[in-house]
Amino acid sequence: MISDIAAAAAAIGAAAVTAQVNIEANIAGIKDEALIAELSGVAALADGVADRAARVVTAVREEIST
């Protein structure tokens, strides 16, 4: 069902945000600047993933409400 797509997208969004917060928390203890830069870049990707997931959820909700 289409609602399963929304549920999966919401789970993906939550996973992306969780990963981002985890990376940000762990960066505080890292001294290697190159690794910090790499991890910061990866963490920034999570914003895009969470945003896309939210758009999918919104699209599904719009579809089922019409």
What are the roles of these predicted feature ranges?
Residues M1-T66:
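A structural signal for small-residue-enriched, beta-sheet-centric alpha/beta enzyme cores
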